[in-house]
Amino acid sequence: MTVLAGTAFAWGMNWLRQSRRSWQPAAVAVFSFGLLLPLGEMIRLHPYQYTHFNHIAGTVRGADDRYMLDYWGLALKQASDGLREELIDRQETAPKGRKWKVAVCGPQRPAQVALGPDFTIGWDSHSADFAMTLGEFYCKGLTAPVMVEIKRDDVVFARVYDIRGRSISSLLAIPAP
């Protein structure tokens, strides 16, 4: 598709050069403007620019209900960094004799790498201190205090909840039939 678009643009520029040379700068300006529109959107979404959807698809906001946006779970890295910063700001330390426990709904490896050795990562939300969830359909929205929220363009990519002292049966949502 890209080759076809490039060929069509080159053909159009050649045609303009031969028949309406004075229109070439305007054509280049329109073409450049067309390239800058999605670039601006991707800059706003950074580092999640791979989730960009054009205006025909409804942008990221419109696509959020129809598609998995952060299927790689990269927002969990930023959420992990936010959790570590929040714990430092609050001057909280792990309970005596154990590491912080984080239940993760989504790919666990990004959170595990970002959090490091001071945290235990797993699925079990019963004994966890925190819950880290992707903003995807399969992760349940919890009624617990939100410690960290990763948002772009009004779309939640990830959240970290403080679930200490709460009974959370599962982080997985039951999809509608």
Roles of regions detected by a PLM:
Residues M1-L4:
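Transmembrane alpha-helices of multi-pass, membrane-embedded glycan-processing enzymes
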Residues G6-F53:
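Signature aromatic-anchored transmembrane alpha helix within multi-pass, membrane-resident enzymes
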Residues E41-Y67, W72:
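Juxtamembrane membrane-water interface segments immediately following transmembrane helices
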Residues V60-P177:
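C-terminal luminal/periplasmic domains and tails of membrane-associated envelope-modifying transferases
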